[in-house]
Amino acid sequence: MATPSMMPQWSYMHISGQDASEYLSPGLVQFARATETYFSLNNKFRNPTVAPTHDVTTDRSQRLTLRFIPVDREDTAYSYKARFTLAVGDNRVLDMASTYFDIRGVLDRGPTFKPYSGTAYNALAPKGAPNSCEWEQTEDSGRAVAEDEEEEDEDEEEEEEEQNARDQATKKTHVYAQAPLSGETITKSGLQIGSDNAETQAKPVYADPSYQPEPQIGESQWNEADANAAGGRVLKKTTPMKPCYGSYARPTNPFGGQSVLVPDEKGVPLPKVDLQFFSNTTSLNDRQGNATKPKVVLYSEDVNMETPDTHLSYKPGKGDENSKAMLGQQSMPNRPNYIAFRDNFIGLMYYNSTGNMGVLAGQASQLNAVVDLQDRNTELSYQLLLDSIGDRTRYFSMWNQAVDSYDPDVRIIENHGTEDELPNYCFPLGGIGVTDTYQAIKANGNGSGDNGDTTWTKDETFATRNEIGVGNNFAMEINLNANLWRNFLYSNIALYLPDKLKYNPTNVEISDNPNTYDYMNKRVVAPGLVDCYINLGARWSLDYMDNVNPFNHHRNAGLRYRSMLLGNGRYVPFHIQVPQKFFAIKNLLLLPGSYTYEWNFRKDVNMVLQSSLGNDLRVDGASIKFDSICLYATFFPMAHNTASTLEAMLRNDTNDQSFNDYLSAANMLYPIPANATNVPISIPSRNWAAFRGWAFTRLKTKETPSLGSGYDPYYTYSGSIPYLDGTFYLNHTFKKVAITFDSSVSWPGNDRLLTPNEFEIKRSVDGEGYNVAQCNMTKDWFLVQMLANYNIGYQGFYIPESYKDRMYSFFRNFQPMSRQVVDDTKYKEYQQVGILHQHNNSGFVGYLAPTMREGQAYPANVPYPLIGKTAVDSITQKKFLCDRTLWRIPFSSNFMSMGALTDLGQNLLYANSAHALDMTFEVDPMDEPTLLYVLFEVFDVVRVHQPHRGVIETVYLRTPFSAGNATT
């Protein structure tokens, strides 16, 4: 095969787009046209469905798909390596574009997997309502109450002393319970719930203590008479107190009973249920003359109490011992955490990693066609390729294609208030509510009664007790719309605020590792930070949320779909199909011969799996195990003579297969320390011929794994990985880009509004009116992005065509916004009131926490009115967001004349031989380390030559970064 140095000089095309993805020789194009009824030489997903109808002599030729079993496996703690021998027979052509790895294994998504919001257990219960329960308390109740109040302030030593004093005192059991089931009578055998009339003498039937009375059965209508005998179940003092919301105890018998089984004398496990009898209080007994008779029986039991999907958001004391104060615990649902394989199985196969790449080698030559380059953008390139050939919003389950997304109403809040003109009422079940008892009377005598001298007497035709309510129906009001909107804001925005704005709930145990689910789940935030009155009437994203990854969210529809594909349980036996993405071999036509094909598959759960919270799945107990990895491959269904003709043509080096990487770029990551604002870059001197431009964005260090190692021990995150999947969201943090070549030529020039050697992205102060679209992006930058993405060099009423305006493009993701805020310099009455002292809806909401409402109804002191006759002085704030896309600066001979030209009309950068490059990026400071991700757009081409059976040779050409690295 000819080496690049022996080949004629390539003629470079300077293009601004990424459309030139594959080049075929004229001979191969002619052949493809002649045989287009048999197969299609398109992109990744060719469709080999038309089998030939003649010249087929063997059964094997009709078998389109074959399964290859690995000849060697290597299963380690961090990876699984599979090696295959591909035998391509005579008159066959194997289509590498159709190959996929068929993988079976077992996935443990860990105890932090929760594929829903809210709770599955008693979701309708109030958050602070206890179960029917019991606790012990000292006989001196006054002292006990005082102890409860002081409990929070005591340290451990005082608690131990207090405990000893309590042990010496007399303890009594207290009960807080409900007895919903009415019975006929109560005896020492319990509650009689019926009679067995089968025998001559009716035999009473008592509740079966193992499961009766059942908690779900009680009075079936609102006006049932008061029960003389009632029963219910109650949890013993030895069962830990938990709020009813979220509490669960597994059944221990087929009837649904939940009592803990205790072995009897013979070792047979039986439910341990004790009957507790209760009468009216003494004063009532004396008044009614009832002596002491049971009115209520409670069936007390211990159960296996669990809270599978909730946790405590408020706890009165540090201890877990049952007490009266513990009745006031508040429960809160665990945060949803979807866990699934990444979009297109990103991260599952090793790419871009030194020493861990795959192998495709002919067994006759053993030359590997896969060349190690640490900055191949294989995963990102594949994402952008798919976007260019199809609609990424349509999911394709076979390849796990469901693109990461976010709810735009969560990223940018359009707070237009709540439509709550009419009040919403709720009424008592009987409609009337509180009634008084009346006696019917009638007029006595024949007088008219107009003078008020009528006498009245009891009306014996009516009952003695008649229930009558006076006035309007009893009702309670709730603002449903405002509550729903407030809950949306808290669940979707407040809980995702940066951790520095959150705090630990009092007395609640919490992990000290901020990467764990336990820590993320239990931290709470004051609802007032994101309430329904914040930025009311504006379309604005919370400034705190702009730099938070919006794709790490339970409303990431793509991740939710991929999670549901696996099911809704923690343990999943999975069976998946994974395509090859490496550009040099994903579209290859493999000619007859025997080949070795080998690849590595990661087992690092943080890389392979994606979670909506981004917690450290390694620490939180997730794991993945591969049981088998097979390879499925498809042969072109061609007649033998057609296949042999194609083989003969492809063996000729003039018909080598050439493939361009879709992204065709060398990437570099430059660290940006926390709070830094300037990032300088230097590129050594080189010839810039064939250079297409720059694309850049910003990544968080925490969210970017080290691809050079198979297992990065410092990678403690499992959310979206912008570096690989294109979920960029920090584009708005760039201010300026300065570009300086070491020549006297200024680039860009001073055309239009462009400042020489500089691109200004946004302006906070815009005295000259350079900004555009009512935000702080400059007109220059808007123009450059429209040119780079759509070749639109002028404005007017012209927006890009839909086929150009794809998911990752600029125009679709550009979101300008503005709002007004109080001008604290002009408005002299302004007071900077801290959140601790702000009140709005006081008395109707919890104080600084998602807990029980407290306070009183009172005029609000926040926010200042920006409308109406009393509107205060205000200033306008402007900004924009532009997620998913890469900022692009084209560098091409047909992209505007952005520099001085020679007499021949040629830019000096092309005329001169080599230049060094200095770039300086000015960015907004962020309080954590980040990375500047720069793609140097080049021509990244591979030529594949198969001169003989079992021989495959490749030449990779990347100009002007020949070795694949921007520093070489």
Swiss-Prot record:
The lineage of its organism: Viruses, Varidnaviria, Bamfordvirae, Preplasmiviricota, Tectiliviricetes. The modification Phosphotyrosine is found at Y956. It comes from Human adenovirus C serotype 2. All late proteins expressed from the major late promoter are produced by alternative splicing and alternative polyadenylation of the same gene giving rise to non-overlapping ORFs. A leader sequence is present in the N-terminus of all these mRNAs and is recognized by the viral shutoff protein to provide expression although conventional translation via ribosome scanning from the cap has been shut off in the host cell. Induction: Expressed in the late phase of the viral replicative cycle. Its main location: virion. GO terms for cellular component: host cell; host cell nucleus; T=25 icosahedral viral capsid. Major capsid protein that self-associates to form 240 hexon trimers, each in the shape of a hexagon, building most of the pseudo T=25 capsid. Assembled into trimeric units with the help of the chaperone shutoff protein. Transported by pre-protein VI to the nucleus where it associates with other structural proteins to form an empty capsid. Might be involved, through its interaction with host dyneins, in the intracellular microtubule-dependent transport of incoming viral capsid to the nucleus. It holds the Pfam family Adeno_hexon_C. The modification Phosphoserine is found at S182, S283. The modification N-acetylalanine is found at A2. Residues 125-188 are annotated as: Disordered. Residues 147-162 have a biased composition (Acidic residues). Homotrimer. Interacts with the capsid vertex protein; this interaction binds the peripentonal hexons to the neighboring penton base. Interacts with the hexon-linking protein; this interaction tethers the hexons surrounding the penton to those situated in the central plate of the facet. Interacts with the hexon-interlacing protein; this interaction lashes the hexons together. Interacts with pre-protein VI; this interaction probably allows nuclear import of hexon trimers and possibly pre-capsid assembly. One of its GO terms (molecular function) is structural molecule activity. Belongs to the adenoviridae hexon protein family. It is found in: Virion; Host nucleus. InterPro entries: Adenovirus_Pll_hexon_C, Adenovirus_Pll_hexon_N, Adenovirus_Pll_hexon_sub2, ADV_hexon, VP_dsDNA_II. The record marks G793 as: Involved in interaction with pre-protein VI. This is Hexon protein. GO terms for biological process: microtubule-dependent intracellular transport of viral material towards nucleus; symbiont entry into host cell. Keywords: Acetylation, Capsid protein, Cytoplasmic inwards viral transport, Host nucleus, Host-virus interaction, Late protein, Microtubular inwards viral transport, Phosphoprotein, T=25 icosahedral capsid protein, Virion, Virus entry into host cell.
